[in-house]
Every structure is written in structure tokens, then in C-alpha cells.
């Protein structure tokens, strides 16, 4: 048994490795418990974050004890005998003895290094206690890597800490966190840890990630916004705040925190003296007074003051606000530190009950506040109860001198009430840049005193950039004082003044007209929603006179009733936009409901010289406004931003704007109109998506920077001069060299010691090289502020402008000389000279037409060049570090090879049983580190990549399956008799994995491939497969109807819808009788019937409902109304319907039906579905046309083609009708028309026909209907009636038949299956079959005395055929009628002869039989024994 220097055999080492797999063993030490001696063998296996004490006397191995390094509270080392004592959380004391001091020191170094990775600021003195010898402790300190030489892991070792905590708590390691940290935070240099990035994880995983921040030195901010924190996460946040000294910012907004959390947070901060917290935001959490009192107490005593404090919308009361104000006023550190204070959204916190000792006491002191937000706190903005500013300030000074700032004296709170502007004018007027006092009261008393505090503050302000007074209901005097103070201040520039919703009205408009021109400090003015109305005319004129206003918001002020006044206002705004001297650049008329009035502004954009931003959202201008906007964008080149949401714009309007942006290259920003897009998406989603994508593509094109510059910018990110895989390679190589050094040991001889020293130097140089990369990046990315370079570039731009002007002048002069020489008489007038001077005047601003970013682009190019230089230098440094590490590792490998000749056998048997082979240095390295060897081979084989995109350190799959597991086939796939596809790929080859111990899989036999040219076929391809059958449970109470087997003649032997016919053939309610003619014996014995189509829509949806035809016929309408069968006569609209082409199954039946009477009434009317009704032309009166209306023409793809009437045919029919003189009836028809007006539309048939009972004659103009068929009983002739115009109708029928034959339509001359209908009236007798000319066909079955078909019991062989089966037929075998309608009719309807007249004046006699020639088999009608679904037996 081969023994290693540490006394552990190779077999035992392999057994331990397999026992602890997949965990990686880093160090094995032989040990024993005190008193047992060396006879009792134990091995201490040290992993990365955990130690295992294994009992190795007998196999299998047994774990006697295991503990995490984070459980170690203290360690005590002893040299004689060499032993260590652990103080653990789970065990009070664990003593282990080792064979030598070297093993003891290795254990101490490994545990100390692991603990230091988790706790970077820990020291060896805290970990090792007495009786640890000082000499041993000194050796351990010298051997432990320092922070400068220790390779830096991503984000300050966050992942290592997180992994250690997962091992300590027994939780799985989440790779999502590892990926985010490696890919996002580290590569982008982000020090802001957001819990929202991991909100999809469980609360325990989230709590572990927060706990890993407790001792992290990289992250500076922890934020959680709009996310409810669980109790575990809250506890870890409190623990982190009590331990972390590097976290500077804590943002917990809208996290459902309560006052108890704030109290505990204050306690945690109070107990941590070295806390680095400087920014705190608890906005959106309901904090009670106790929580605010505890936080205020901490803020009052903390040595390090906060820079930012946000307590917006926290439910602060006046008591909590007073406590906070006193804390800020008491701690003098806040005067020079606090710059951002947000207390907005706390109504009543600064109300009338607030005294002078609260927040105003801090604001009145000199401080450095730059951001103050007190919106919605009910604070008084100016003087209350007439108190003067000077007296209030004097009293406050006396009070502060007498009480030292701890509280106001008696009576001060009543005599000196608080004022906001009075306080800030004394305290922070020189440093305040943002003041938001919106939604507050200006004054609580009606005082006529001038608001001196407001005017005083505005005259003293120096750096103010934003003043928000929205919703404060400013009186005219306050507005006048406001503008006067701004007029007196000569220090302010670019101030944004928000006066929206202040109810200024006419008085405020007059003040603004008088003083806005003098307020030169205001560059942006928001006057929205102030009810100006008609005063907008003069107000716009006053705004146009201002020379400082660049942005004006006038929305929600156009509530003008007079249209002329509104037009006047809009035209004044247009003049303001087109004025060359007006500096206005941005205009907002949002939420004004201008509708078509916005078109005036949009037309003005075509000639706009200055406007760069426009907001026209909320004006309901529709698609017309969108089209005008599109036209303006085609010619406008000054606009940079357009906002146009909430305008009722459809997809067409969006598409117009998108197409206009194709020609606009200057628009940079157009926020997506979400409301309009959401509405348009519902109606036309495809067109909307196309328009949105086109808009975004055009904006991206307009904002695209130089591709070379963008490539450099993305490549050279912070901490990214060298790609992360290169840094990872350096770190891995450092680790590999360190492992070689540890493997070499101390007794390696002079050459080994030299190799170790070289390796240590290489590691130190590599770590130092990586540490200077951020310095190189800062040096390369620092902006160039060389004033000489800037002056030269600006001078160069001026020179370019002068050259352009000179070029234009030369071109103009040459053009004039040429024009004068060619046409001197045309240039004698003076008008052309004025026009030419106007054009040349535009060349004065030619330097402004040069690229606006030319100067910035020049500095950007310089920065990119500097980054390229530093990047090249960084790459060379890293390359040198890699070369040094590789050389050191090669030297160590040579030393290991020389040492192996002494400690290991010189030769090993060959794997194939041949002669033993000597080990080369590379083979020895592959023996110890097979994974690294394979990785190097893969790197050598793969092409080199200078800038890899993905880090090699990202292991998204933590577990590696062994080769045996990969090669083992699944039982289902390997079982014989199954359709198993051959497996290919690396998983099927069974290559052994080095990381997976176990016996290697044997080589698989080679597969015999077919010769070239022969296709690869699976061996089970020809195997017969069983027929798939789906057994459906029959419905309760339904008859068991066996499904009909498919016909072989139809070519449907393999159907894909087995079981569908069984489903459709079963009924929930028993049917006793059903109208069905008998089957034709000729059809049964002749051609093979085509399978029937699927019953759809009304035919199958209401299959459980008994049809009306099953009920007995009734002769009296009064006694039994509505159920008697009604005979439906063929109308003129049925004549004009195009007949269908017969199928194969119909030809034989049609040939047999040629022997019957050729009466037109006997022709079977084609049965159309609702969609196919688009081909029918119905003649209805004008009133019926208005009542019914026309449905849109919706057709299916299979219905287009030969069955469609051409427009020319319809025109010919109309000409025929005009020739024969069809007109409206009169006389007795009027009475019948009035009587039957209530029953104009009786009911809809199963195929969508609307039964019309009107007797009114149709107009001469023919209009196609999609779903209406006239069935007027008054139009139906009697048994023997013949009108005088029968010859005319006969001629029309012959012409129609000839027209149909010329178009190639199938002629149906034989008798169709007559459909039994209901009698139209109880007093009218139904015509007999003899009088109607109906043939006595045996296939139709017997008839009753009324000429109706008698009902027949339900056939047992009925079944439903799916649509898929019908589509499998060949096109030649599928009849045209199947293409038109798959709807199954409930019963055939009896066809009546067409009415000879359409009104009462045309007679009531039926047409005589029309003799026709027998048709050919191609034109034969369908057999009566076959229904319209393809020739199957009729039900």
C-alpha cells in the first residue's frame, strides 16, 4: 500500500474523496483523540468551509464529528504534544492530537484563512487563545497572506461569505445570486445592493444575502423599494446595521415597516459606535410617535450626522415632528452635514399646533440644506397674525440666547408663530437649490400685510433652481411679492417656478402680465390649471415679451366657451412659437381637451424656428391630429421631444406618425403613448405593434452615437480595462501555483526552495498588477479639461463657420452673375433682391447648424483614445503576470517531478498491459491536477479570444454527472419492442468525467452505418403498430350508437379523429322520430358515398334539443300556434343564388332523377350557411332593408372561387328586371303590408335564413343580402293561379339558366329533396304534390296529404365526421358544396315553386312547368338519397 508523506495511503485518500463527493477535499490530516493513541486511526478532512472527523479503522467510513468554521469561537494550540483545542457552538470542547507541529500549523492556517475571508477585519490574536505559543503565532502571522497579496474575489468576497453562511445554516447555494454578483455588480462596479434583484427567491435565501453584507467591505448601499420585508429579512437588516461599518446608505421605502422596526433600528445604531450610515430613507412606512421619538433620540446623540434623511409619507404627527426638529437643532453636526431633508406627504405635521421649538428652530439656524421638501405638511408659508419678520427674528435670537436652543420660553409659541419663508431666509437661503412647498396654506389668517418673508427670502436666495408652490392658492399680493422678489434678485438664473393649481384666475393673470417680464431669473414657468380662461389672450402676449422664459406650461386653462376667443388664444400661441426673438423652447398644453383646436398648433410646427419640446397630451385630437403631427414632423428639424399621449389615437394614427419619423432625423425623444397604444392594441394589435416598433427604431436611429465610440465605451467599463475572464484566469493561476507550492512542501531542496520563492514573487506581482487596474482606469477615463485645447476647438468651429459663410456668398454671387447673363430682363425688379436677402440672413446662424455635439464628440474621442492607451497597458501588465505565473508553475512542476523520483515508484504499469512507462513532468501534473490539464488542452484547442463575453468563473451547473450515469440508458428507451430513437451526442458516448470518481464505462460497440447514398432508416420503421382507440364513456341515458367504420373507397383508412363520431352521435335526450328520406338503393349499390362533414355551429350546439319537425302538424293556428309545419316556397332570391357543383356521389343520383318532371320548382335549393348567404340577392322593400340591414361580407377561404357571382352578372340581372318592368304593388297590398308589419321578421332558420312575412314588393334596385331570405306567404301562389306575366318570368328563368350554364355552374334540373315546412296560415290549404309538380320519387319516402315528407325513425348508422377527416380527401373527391358549408342541416326543407310575382299586383298563380333538357352527368343535381354533406345517406 503506497504511503504519502502525511501517512495517509492513496487508497484511503480516494475512499475519502468518494465518500465526501461532490464536496471537494482541500486537506487531509491524520489525527486521534487524546488517550486513544495512534492506534485509533482518525482523519481530519478539511473542506472549504467545514471540517469532518472521520473514523477510518474499518470500512465503510464513519463521521464522528463535523463542524463549520463559523462555529469556531476560539482555538488553542500546543506544541508538546502537538494538539489543538476547539471551542465550538455545538461542542464545548474538542481536542485533537497530531503527529507533528507541521500538521498542526497547516490546520491553523487553513481555518484562520477561511474565517478571515468571511470576517476581513478579524485578527489571529482574537482567534487563538492561550496556551498558544507566541512563536507559533508569529509564524502563522508571517505565513498568512496579507490584503495586498491576497487575490481579490468579486465584490469584496461577497460570494465566499454567502457560501460560508449557506454551509453554516445548511441552506443550498443559490446560483442566481452568484450570477448577479459576478455579472452585474462586479463587472459594472456597482456598490448598490438591491433586494429587488432577488425578490423571486425565498425569504431565507434573501436573509442570507443580507447577512453576507454585514462584514462586506465592497457594498455601500442597501435598498429595498416597494417590497414587503419578512421578519427574517428584517432581523438580518438590523443585525447588519449593528455590525457593518462600511454601509453608508440604507433605503427601505414602502416596505410595510412599523414603528417597532424603527425603535430596534435606533437601538442597533446606538450600540454601534463605528457605524458609517450617512443616508437614511424610510419613506412610505407608517411610523408611530414612539418610533420617531426613539429615532430622534438617536439622531440627537449620534456623533456622525446624516447627509440625507427622507421620512416622506410616514404618518408623522406634530409630536413626532417636534421631536425630530429638536434632535436636528440640538445636534450641531447636522448644521454642517445635512443637505437633503424630505418630510413631504405628512398632512398636519407642521400645522397650527406646531410651535417654534420644532423644525423651524433648525431651519432658522445657518445650515447647508440644499434640498428641502415640505409638500403637503400644512405648513404656513408666510406671516401669520401680522407678525413682522424682524420682530420674530429678534425674539428668536433672544430665545436662543436665553434657553440655548432647548425650548421656547413661556409665551413665545403664542406671540411668535412659525413661518417657513421667515425661517429659511435666515438659515439656508445661500445654499438651498430645491424648495418644494406645494399643497400648503399660504396664510391661516386674512391679513392685508405685505408678505415680507417671501419677498425677503427670494431676494436673498443665491443658488435656488426649483421653487414649487403648486396648489397653495396664492393671493394676488403674495404673487406680486413673489415676482417682485425675483425681479430684485440678480444672482438667480434658470429658476423653475411651479404655480400650477393656485387658483390665480383673472387677478393673478393681471399680476403675471405686469411683472413676468421683470423676473429675469425665471426660465421655466408652470401656470397649468389656474382658470385663466379668456385672460389667456393677454397672458400669452405678456409671456412673449419675456426674454428669459424658455419653458411654459399652459395646460388646463383653455376652458373658454366662446370659440372665437379660443381661436384667438391659439393664434397668439402660434405667434409666440414663430417669433424669432422669443426664446421659448418648450411648450406644454397638456390636458386641455383642445380636440380639433390642437390642429392650429400642429400646423405651426412646420415653420417653427425655436421650439424644441412640445407636450400636447390629453387633448383628444384623434387620428386627424395625429396626421397633422405626422406632416409637421416630416418638415420640422428643430423638435427634439414630443409628448402626445391620451389623444384617442388609433393604430392608423400611430402608423402615420411612425412613417413620418422615417424622414425625421432630429427628434430624439418621444415617450411611448401608453394609453393610446393600449386602446389601439385591442382593435388592431398587429398594426399597433408595427407602428410602435417603427417609432422606437427611428428614435434609436436618431439617438445612435458613433459605433466606434460606443464599442469602446462598452468594452472599457469601470474595472473592465481587462476582461473579467482574464482576471479570473490570473486568480485561478495564482491559486494553482499556491497549490503546487503546498504540494511541494518544505523539504524540497535548494532547487525547490528557489522555485517556491519564484512562485511567491509571481503571485505578489500578479496581485499587485490587478490592484493597479482601477487606478489606470481612473487615469484614462478622467475628462480632459485643458483650456488651450478647448479654446483651439472653439476657434476651429468659428473658422469653419466663416468658411461656410464665405462659400455661401461666393455661390450666391456666381449664381446671380449667371442669371443676369442668361435672363437680364427677369432680374430688373427689386422683389427678388429682398427674397434673396431673407435667405442669406439665415446664414448668420450657420455655426449653430453645425453638429451640436461636435465639441463633445472631440472630447469623447480623446477620452476613448486615452482609455485605449491605458487598456493596452493593462493588457500587457496582465500578460506579463500570466507569463510569470506560468513560468513559476513550470518550475514547481519540475521540482515535483524530481521529488517524485524519490518518494514515488519510478515507473507505473501501462494501461494496456505493456511495459511500464516513466512519468514526464507534464504527465505528473496531469496526475495530480487532471481538471486543470484538461482545461489547458481545451484552451489550446479552442481559438484565442481577447475579449470573452462570459466569465469562466460562472458555474451555472453545480453537479457533474458521472460517466456511468450518462452512459446508462433509460429503461423505457432501451427496452425492446419500443420505438426508441438512437441517441447521439456526448451524453451517449459515456466518456469518463475526471470529477466523478468511479469505474470507467466500457467502450461502446461501433454502429454499422449504411453505405453512401442509402438513406438512414430506423430498424423499427416497418414494424406494425396497433390501432389507437379512445374509449369514451357514454353520456348517462344516451343510446349506444356504434360509430360507422370508414370506407376504404374514400382513402381514409387511417383517420386521425377516431372517437369523434362516437361523441357526436350520442344524444342526451331520446329522439323517437326524425325527418329523413329513405336511402336510395341505387346509391347504396353504386358509387361509394363520400363521408359526411362535421356537424358544427347550430346543428351540433343544439343537438340535444328536439327539432320542431318532430312535433305533430297542427291545422289550427289559434289552438296550437307556432308548431305546425310550414311549407317554404322558393322565392326569387333562391333563383338568383348560384347553384353548386355536384359531387361524385351526387352524379348517379342525379342521373336517375332526370326522369322526373323538369319543373323549376323541383330543383333543389342549395343549402347555404350563414357565411355563404353573401352570394344571395334578396329583393325586399325599402322598409325591410332599413330594418334588416346588410351584414358584412364574410367568407371563408374555401368559399371563394367558382361559386362567386361576378358583378357583371348582377348588373345583367338588374337590367333584366328593368326590362320586364318589376314595380311595387299597390291597392290591396298596402293593407296586407300594414297588417304583417309587426311580424316582419318571425324567426331565423337553422342556417341563418330570416323568415320574412312582409307582403311589400321589393324595389327595382337589387342589393345583395348576406343572411336574409324572403318567405312572404302572400307571395306564394295558389294551386292553380297563373298571372298574365308568367311568360315574362319564364323568359327570365331561361335567361338566368343560360347565364349560369355559360359560367360553368352545375345545373340542377332534377328534383331536389323537398323540405317540409310549416303552413303559413291555417286557412290556406297546402298544395298537393300533383299541383306542385313534385315527382313521386321512392327515394324520398311516402308523403302525406299535404305533400309533406313523413317522418322516419332515427337511423342507427348515423355518425358525425370530423373536419379533419373531410380535409383529408383529395380535392377532386371533395364536392364544392363541402367547401362552402360544413354545417349540418337539421332536416330537408320542402322546396316550393318560385313565386310568379313579388307583389299583389302581379298575380297569384304559380308558374307552369318549364321543360328543360336532361343534363349531363357533370351537371346532374344531387341525388335525393344523398344529403348535402357529400353524398352520404340522408338522416
Curated annotation (Swiss-Prot):
LRR repeat coordinates: 64-88, 89-111, 249-272, 274-297, 303-326, 335-362, 393-423, 429-452, 461-481, 492-514, 519-543, 546-572, 581-604, 608-631, 636-660, 664-687
One Pfam family this sequence matches: CARMIL_C
Region (Tropomodulin-like): 573-667
Gene3D superfamilies (alphabetical): Pleckstrin-homology domain (PH domain)/Phosphotyrosine-binding domain (PTB), Ribonuclease Inhibitor
Region (Disordered): 965-1435
GO molecular function: phospholipid binding; protein-containing complex binding
Tissue: Expressed in all tissues tested, including thymus, spleen, colon, leukocytes, peripheral blood, skin, skin keratinocytes and skin fibroblasts. Strong expression is detected in naive and memory CD4+ and CD8+ T cells, naive and memory B cells, regulatory T cells and NK cells, whereas it is poorly expressed in monocytes.
Related illness: Immunodeficiency 58: An autosomal recessive primary immunodeficiency characterized by a variety of infectious diseases, including mycobacterial diseases, mucocutaneous candidiasis, silent but detectable EBV viremia, and staphylococcal diseases. Patients suffer from dermatitis, esophagitis, recurrent skin abscesses and chest infections. Immunologic analysis shows defective T-cell function and deficient CD3/CD28 stimulation responses in both CD4+ and CD8+ T cells. B-cell function may also be impaired.
Name of this protein: Capping protein, Arp2/3 and myosin-I linker protein 2
Originating species: Homo sapiens
Lineage: Eukaryota, Metazoa, Chordata, Craniata, Vertebrata
Gene: CARMIL2
Amino acid at each position: 500500500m503506497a504511503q504519502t508523506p502525511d501517512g495517509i495511503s492513496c487508497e484511503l485518500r480516494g475512499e475519502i474523496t468518494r465518500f465526501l463527493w461532490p464536496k471537494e477535499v482541500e486537506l487531509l490530516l491524520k489525527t486521534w483523540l487524546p488517550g486513544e493513541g495512534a492506534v485509533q486511526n482518525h482523519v481530519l478532512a478539511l473542506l472549504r468551509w467545514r471540517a469532518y472527523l472521520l473514523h477510518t479503522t474499518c470500512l465503510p467510513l464513519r463521521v464522528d464529528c463535523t463542524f463549520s468554521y463559523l462555529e469556531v469561537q476560539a482555538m488553542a494550540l500546543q506544541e508538546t504534544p502537538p494538539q489543538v483545542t476547539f471551542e465550538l457552538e455545538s461542542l464545548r470542547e474538542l481536542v485533537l492530537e497530531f503527529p507533528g507541529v507541521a500538521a498542526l500549523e497547516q490546520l491553523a492556517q487553513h481555518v484562520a484563512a477561511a474565517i478571515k475571508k468571511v470576517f476581513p477585519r478579524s485578527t489571529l490574536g482574537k482567534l487563538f487563545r492561550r496556551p498558544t505559543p507566541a512563536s507559533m503565532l508569529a509564524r502563522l502571522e508571517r505565513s498568512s497572506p496579507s490584503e495586498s497579496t491576497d487575490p481579490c474575489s468579486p465584490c469584496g468576497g461577497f460570494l465566499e461569505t454567502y457560501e460560508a453562511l449557506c454551509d453554516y445554516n445548511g441552506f443550498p447555494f443559490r446560483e442566481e445570486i452568484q450570477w448577479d454578483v459576478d455579472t452585474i455588480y462586479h463587472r459594472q462596479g456597482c456598490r448598490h445592493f438591491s433586494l429587488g434583484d432577488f425578490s423571486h427567491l425565498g425569504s431565507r435565501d434573501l436573509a442570507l444575502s443580507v447577512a453576507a453584507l454585514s462584514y462586506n467591505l465592497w457594498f455601500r448601499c442597501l435598498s429595498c423599494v416597494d417590497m414587503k420585508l419578512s421578519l427574517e429579512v428584517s432581523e438580518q437588516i438590523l443585525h447588519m446595521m449593528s455590525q457593518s461599518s462600511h454601509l453608508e446608505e440604507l433605503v427601505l421605502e414602502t416596505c410595510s415597516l412599523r414603528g417597532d422596526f424603527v425603535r430596534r433600528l435606533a437601538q442597533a445604531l446606538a450600540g454601534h459606535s463605528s457605524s458609517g450610515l450617512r443616508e437614511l430613507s424610510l419613506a412610505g412606512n407608517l411610523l408611530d410617535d414612539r418610533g420617531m421619538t426613539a429615532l430622534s433620540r438617536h439622531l440627537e446623540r449620534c456623533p456622525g450626522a446624516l447627509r440625507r434623511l427622507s421620512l416622506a409619507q410616514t404618518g408623522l404627527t406634530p409630536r413626532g415632528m417636534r421631536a425630530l426638529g429638536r434632535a436636528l437643532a440640538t445636534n450641531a453636526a447636522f448644521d454642517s452635514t445635512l443637505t437633503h431633508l424630505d418630510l413631504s406627504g405628512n398632512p398636519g405635521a407642521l400645522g397650527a399646533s406646531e410651535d417654534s421649538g420644532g423644525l423651524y428652530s433648525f431651519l432658522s439656524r445657518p445650515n447647508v440644506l440644499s434640498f428641502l421638501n415640505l409638500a403637503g405638511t400644512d405648513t404656513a408659508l408666510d406671516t401669520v397674525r401680522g407678525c413682522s419678520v424682524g420682530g420674530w427674528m429678534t425674539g428668536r435670537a433672544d430665545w436662543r440666547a436665553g434657553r440655548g436652543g432647548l425650548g421656547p420660553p413661556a409665551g413665545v409659541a403664542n406671540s411668535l408663530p412659525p413661518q417657513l419663508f421667515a425661517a429659511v431666509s435666515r438659515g439656508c437661503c445661500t445654499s438651498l437649490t430645491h424648495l418644494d412647498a406645494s399643497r400648503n396654506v399660504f396664510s391661516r389668517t386674512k391679513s392685508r400685510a405685505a408678505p415680507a418673508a417671501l419677498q425677503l427670502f427670494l431676494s436673498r436666495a443665491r443658488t435656488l433652481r426649483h421653487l414649487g408652490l403648486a396648489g397653495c392658492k396664492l393671493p394676488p399680493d403674495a404673487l406680486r411679492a413673489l415676482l417682485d422678489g425675483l425681479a430684485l434678485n440678480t444672482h438667480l438664473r434658470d429658476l423653475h417656478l411651479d404655480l400650477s393649481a393656485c387658483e390665480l384666475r383673472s387677478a393673478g393673470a393681471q399680476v403675471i402680465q405686469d411683472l413676468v417680464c421683470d423676473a429675469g431669473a425665471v426660465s421655466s414657468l408652470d401656470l397649468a390649471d389656474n382658470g385663466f380662461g379668456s385672460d389667456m389672450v393677454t397672458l400669452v402676449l405678456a409671456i412673449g415679451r419675456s426674454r428669459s422664459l424658455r419653458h411654459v406650461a399652459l395646460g388646463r386653462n383653455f376652458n373658454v366657451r366662446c370659440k372665437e376667443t379660443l381661436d384667438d388664444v391659439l393664434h397668439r400661441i402660434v405667434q409666440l412659437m414663430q417669433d424669432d426673438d422669443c426664446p421659448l423652447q418648450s411648450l406644454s398644453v397638456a390636458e386641455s381637451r383642445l380636440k380639433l383646436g390642437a390642429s392650429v398648433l400642429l400646423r405651426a410646427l412646420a415653420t417653427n424656428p425655436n421650439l424644441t419640446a412640445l407636450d400636447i397630451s390629453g387633448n383628444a385630437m384623434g387620428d386627424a391630429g395625429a396626421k397633422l403631427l405626422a406632416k409637421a414632423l416630416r418638415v420640422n428639424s428643430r423638435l427634439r421631444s414630443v409628448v402626445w399621449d391620451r389623444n384617442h389615437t388609433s393604430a392608423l394614427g400611430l402608423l402615420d406618425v411612425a412613417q413620418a419619423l422615417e424622414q425625421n432625423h432630429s427628434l430624439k425623444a418621444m415617450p411611448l403613448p401608453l394609453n393610446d397604444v393600449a386602446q389601439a392594441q385591442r382593435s388592431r394589435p398587429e398594426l399597433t405593434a408595427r407602428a410602435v416598433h417603427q417609432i422606437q427604431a427611428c428614435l434609436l436611429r436618431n439617438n445612435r452615437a458613433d459605433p466606434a465610440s460606443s464599442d469602446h465605451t462598452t468594452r472599457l467599463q469601470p474595472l473592465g480595462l481587462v476582461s473579467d475572464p482574464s482576471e479570473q484566469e490570473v486568480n485561478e493561476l495564482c491559486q494553482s501555483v499556491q497549490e503546487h507550492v503546498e504540494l511541494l512542501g518544505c523539504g524540497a531542496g535548494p532547487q525547490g526552495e528557489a522555485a517556491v520563492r519564484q512562485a511567491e514573487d509571481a503571485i505578489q506581482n500578479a496581485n499587485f498588477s490587478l490592484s493597479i487596474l482601477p487606478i489606470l482606469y481612473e487615469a484614462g477615463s478622467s475628462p480632459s479639461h485643458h483650456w488651450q485645447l478647448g479654446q483651439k476647438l472653439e476657434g476651429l468651429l468659428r473658422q469653419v463657420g466663416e468658411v461656410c459663410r464665405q462659400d455661401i456668398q461666393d455661390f450666391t454671387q456666381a449664381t446671380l452673375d449667371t442669371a443676369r447673363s442668361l435672363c437680364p430682363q427677369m432680374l430688373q425688379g427689386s422683389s427678388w433682391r429682398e427674397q434673396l436677402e431673407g435667405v442669406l440672413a439665415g446664414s448668420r446662424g450657420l455655426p449653430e447648424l453645425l453638429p451640436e455635439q461636435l465639441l463633445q464628440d472631440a472630447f469623447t474621442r480623446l477620452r476613448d483614445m486615452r482609455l485605449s492607451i491605458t487598456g493596452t497597458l493593462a493588457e500587457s501588465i496582465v500578460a506579463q503576470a500570466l507569463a510569470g505565473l506560468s513560468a513559476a508553475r513550470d518550475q514547481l512542476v519540475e521540482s515535483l517531478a524530481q521529488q517524485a523520483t524519490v518518494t514515488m515508484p519510478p515507473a507505473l504499469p501501462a494501461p494496456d498491459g505493456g511495459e511500464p512507462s516513466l512519468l514526464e513532468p507534464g504527465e505528473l501534473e496531469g496526475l495530480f491536477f487532471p481538471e486543470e490539464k484538461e482545461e489547458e488542452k481545451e484552451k489550446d484547442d479552442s481559438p484565442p479570444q481577447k475579449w470573452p463575453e462570459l466569465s469562466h468563473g460562472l458555474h451555472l451547473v453545480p453537479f457533474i454527472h458521472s460517466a456511468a450515469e450518462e452512459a446508462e440508458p433509460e429503461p423505457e428507451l432501451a427496452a425492446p419492442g419500443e420505438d426508441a430513437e438512437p441517441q447521439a451526442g456526448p451524453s451517449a458516448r459515456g466518456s469518463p468525467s475526471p470529477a466523478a470518481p468511479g469505474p470507467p464505462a466500457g467502450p461502446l460497440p461501433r454502429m454499422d452505418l449504411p453505405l453512401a447514398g442509402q438513406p438512414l432508416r430506423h430498424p423499427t420503421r416497418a414494424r406494425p403498430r396497433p390501432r389507437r382507440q379512445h374509449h369514451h364513456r357514454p353520456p348517462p341515458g344516451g343510446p349506444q350508437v356504434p360509430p360507422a367504420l370508414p370506407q376504404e373507397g374514400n382513402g381514409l383508412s387511417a383517420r386521425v379523429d377516431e372517437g369523434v363520431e362516437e361523441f357526436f352521435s350520442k344524444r342526451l335526450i331520446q329522439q323517437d322520430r326524425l325527418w329523413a328520406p329513405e336511402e336510395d338503393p341505387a346509391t347504396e349499390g353504386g358509387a361509394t358515398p363520400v363521408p359526411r362533414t362535421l356537424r358544427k355551429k347550430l346543428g351540433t350546439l343544439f343537438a340535444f334539443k328536439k327539432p320542431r319537425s318532430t312535433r305533430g302538424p297542427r291545422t289550427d293556428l289559434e289552438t296550437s300556434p307556432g308548431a305546425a309545419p310550414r311549407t317554404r316556397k322558393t322565392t326569387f332570391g333562391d333563383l338568383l343564388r348560384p347553384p353548386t357543383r355536384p359531387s361524385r356521389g351526387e352524379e348517379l343520383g342525379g342521373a336517375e332523377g332526370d326522369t322526373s318532371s323538369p319543373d323549376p320548382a323541383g330543383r333543389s335549393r342549395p343549402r347555404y350557411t350563414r357565411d355563404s348567404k353573401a352570394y344571395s340577392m334578396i329583393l325586399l322593400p325599402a322598409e325591410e332593408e332599413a330594418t334588416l340591414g346588410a351584414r358584412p361580407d364574410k367568407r371563408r377561404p374555401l368559399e371563394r372561387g367558382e361559386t362567386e357571382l361576378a358583378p357583371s352578372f348582377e348588373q345583367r340581372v338588374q337590367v333584366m328586371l328593368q326590362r320586364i318592368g318589376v314595380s311595387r304593388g299597390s291597392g290591396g297590398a298596402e293593407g296586407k303590408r300594414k297588417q304583417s308589419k309587426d311580424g316582419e321578421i318571425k324567426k331565423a332558420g337553422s342556417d341563418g335564413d330570416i323568415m320574412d312575412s312582409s307582403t311589400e314588393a321589393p324595389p327595382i334596385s337589387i342589393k345583395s343580402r348576406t343572411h336574409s331570405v324572403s318567405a312572404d306567404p302572400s307571395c306564394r301562389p295558389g294551386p292553380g293561379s297563373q298571372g298574365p306575366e308568367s311568360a315574362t318570368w319564364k323568359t327570365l328563368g331561361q335567361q338566368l339558366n343560360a347565364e349560369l350554364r355559360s359560367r360553368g355552374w352545375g345545373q340542377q334540373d332534377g328534383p331536389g329533396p323537398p323540405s317540409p315546412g310549416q303552413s303559413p296560415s291555417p286557412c290556406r290549404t297546402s298544395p298537393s304534390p300533383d299541383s306542385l309538380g313534385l315527382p313521386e320519387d321512392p327515394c324520398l319516402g311516402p308523403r302525406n296529404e299535404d305533400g309533406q315528407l313523413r317522418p322516419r325513425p332515427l337511423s342507427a348508422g348515423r355518425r358525425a365526421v370530423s373536419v379533419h377527416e373531410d380535409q383529408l380527401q383529395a380535392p377532386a373527391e371533395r364536392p364544392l358544396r363541402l367547401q362552402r358549408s360544413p354545417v349540418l342541416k337539421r332536416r330537408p326543407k320542402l322546396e316550393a315553386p318560385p313565386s310568379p310575382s313579388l307583389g299583389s299586383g302581379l298575380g297569384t298563380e304559380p308558374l307552369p312547368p318549364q321543360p328543360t333538357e336532361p343534363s349531363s352527368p357533370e351537371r346532374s343535381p344531387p341525388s335525393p338519397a344523398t344529403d348535402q354533406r357529400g353524398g352520404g345517406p340522408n338522416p
